[in-house]
Amino acid sequence: MACSTLSKSPKDKIDPRDLLIPLILFLSLKGARSAAPGSSPHQVYNITWEVTNGDRETVWAISGNHPLWTWWPVLTPDLCMLALSGPPHWGLEYQAPYSSPPGPPCCSGSSGNVAGCARDCNEPLTSLTPRCNTAWNRLKLDQVTHKSSEGFYVCPGSHRPREAKSCGGPDSFYCASWGCETTGRVYWKPSSSWDYITVDNNLTSNQAVQVCKDNKWCNPLAIRFTNAGKQVTSWTTGHYWGLRLYVSGQDPGLTFGIRLSYQNLGPRIPIGPNPVLADQLSFPLPNPLPKPAKSPPASSSTPTLISPSPTPTQPPPAGTGDRLLNLVQGAYQALNLTNPDKTQECWLCLVSGPPYYEGVAVLGTYSNHTSAPANCSVASQHKLTLSEVTGRGLCIGTVPKTHQALCNTTLKAGKGSYYLVAPTGTMWACNTGLTPCLSATVLNRTTDYCVLVELWPRVTYHPPSYVYSQFEKSHRHKREPVSLTLALLLGGLTMGGIAAGVGTGTTALVATQQFQQLHAAVQDDLKEVEKSITNLEKSLTSLSEVVLQNRRGLDLLFLKEGGLCAALKEECCFYADHTGLVRDSMAKLRERLSQRQKLFESSQGWFEGWFNRSPWFTTLISTIMGPLIILLLILLFGPCILNRLVQFVKDRISVVQALVLTQQYHQLKPLEYEPQ
């Protein structure tokens, strides 16, 4: 150990103090597992486990493509690698990380005597202090680590409980007192239920001897992660331990650390002055018309050289505006293919506010992959959430009761390390976000759940009457305006079939009789709008031509004869303003809307017209209508009811008076006269 005054009796190796209770409390305070900020837990990264020396320099590493916190390989650095640039008693204080094994080889290696060798490794080994600077010393170190009466032990440093204050710091290799060791290869076999790793030899003694004779690193360790270590997500900052040899005298030691680093697969670096606006492409200029080829003179006998045809260039990628327009065009094509009757007259509008997409749960057959597919490594800057998911489809994982209504079939992920890839045209909508593939390891380790969904843009379907009504002065609707989304009309198209329940909304697609006249004029209005846009395009084209002419004219400043037009030999050298045509077309459109407004008002009854005269008239009528009706009923039926009530009261009073009078008189008995 660190202090030479400590006794070396085997009985002192066992610490009677029990630290289990504070250690368990410490473990219970560890934070919950989390993936990279703003990413899906199923996303695949290039993960690297690094083993560092005492100066926190990487001396050994292993990499692989896996989701975070699912890959726990066995780390096999050599013991002497941990001593690179380490304490002087290891003999490698001047060796940089990743250096080859230093020192002369043994004279009795596997290839026989070697030039410049030092000592024969077959000679009896002495009890010299084991070092790593020669093959002989590394062979001695191998004997120490495999001997039953010697060995090595490991003490935790950065993550140990606060109660273990007597274990010291890096200067004592975190093993200042007995009882601090949690793992290692010594006869008392230290262990711990809370430490993150276990450390053992990775080679047998016979295997290590032969490797040492060949002048190689021959003391590899086997570092394995414990269950407690697999629950920790602070590996990116690193954890550190101390390792000491159990030999006679003072125990030599060193410190090492383990940390994790990860990065996205394939760098995606924007190029340009503004990475945010790199994809905001401008509208492409119209391709110039090819100039007609001039035929050579008939009398010319010189052979003409045929220039090779230019290689066709690929069209530039679509900008943001083009992508939005493609969404609407794709929605129309899909709707026209499946329901052509609904595309005769309609308006498809791309929703400008969130949510921009919605999902339809579907049933499908996913595929299993033992290695991570390419689409599993696609990085996402944010976790995408579907705020609206409808239908019933395939679910996987631990689905809560609040979301079981979305599940037609619920499956459990089997054990093993593999990936579940969604079918083409679908994605997994998980409680952690959207992802094209799932990691079975993540599903088995967590309580996540996912639903197989189709992703549809929020494109709303409107009948023509709804759009024209927005231009009318009256915004009063007898019923809520129709607003069917593309997901309701085409849900389940990818997996075969239309979403259930669409038939219940077909009656809403039928316009009222008052708007039938508006439907017939849709095509005419669209033609007028098209003409306006065409005229505007001509104006912009004419303006651009003038700008180009002016630029070319600047190159001909020294040509002073005839002016700019004569020098350029242009037939047209003025700006043709067609904005007046645009104003005329828009005026015609407004006139037609006004005519339809009058036609709509003429088709209404006199009573319906009251409610369109002013916005407060409807509120006034609905407020006083109730009291007026009650007052009218009182005036009509009040006198009759009052007379009947008075007559009833009089009858009751007369009966009471008769009863009172009868009780004031007594009936006289008749007298009997006797005959005389």
Curated annotation (Swiss-Prot):
Keywords for the protein's UniProt record, in alphabetical order: Cleavage on pair of basic residues, Coiled coil, Disulfide bond, Fusion of virus membrane with host cell membrane, Fusion of virus membrane with host membrane, Glycoprotein, Host cell membrane, Host membrane, Host-virus interaction, Lipoprotein, Membrane, Metal-binding, Palmitate, Signal, Transmembrane, Transmembrane helix, Viral attachment to host cell, Viral envelope protein, Viral penetration into host cytoplasm, Virion, Virus entry into host cell, Zinc
Pfam families tied to this protein: TLV_coat
GO biological process, one term: fusion of virus membrane with host plasma membrane
Transmembrane segments: 621-641
InterPro entries, A to Z: FMuLV_rcpt-bd, TLV/ENV_coat_polyprotein
GO cellular component annotations of the record: host cell plasma membrane; membrane; viral envelope; virion membrane
Record-listed Zn(2+) binding positions: H89, D120
Residue stretches in coiled coil: 513-547
Motif window: CX6CC: 565-573
Segments of this protein annotated with the region Disordered: 287-321
Lipid-acceptor residues (S-palmitoyl cysteine): C640
Motif interval(s): YXXL motif: 665-668
Region (Fusion peptide): 482-502
CDD domains recorded: HTLV-1-like_HR1-HR2
GO molecular function: metal ion binding
Signal peptide region: 1-34
Quaternary data: The mature envelope protein (Env) consists of a trimer of SU-TM heterodimers attached by a labile interchain disulfide bond.
Domain remarks: The YXXL motif is involved in determining the exact site of viral release at the surface of infected mononuclear cells and promotes endocytosis. The 17 amino acids long immunosuppressive region is present in many retroviral envelope proteins. Synthetic peptides derived from this relatively conserved sequence inhibit immune function in vitro and in vivo.
Protein name per the record: Envelope glycoprotein
Organism: Friend murine leukemia virus (isolate FB29) (FrMLV)
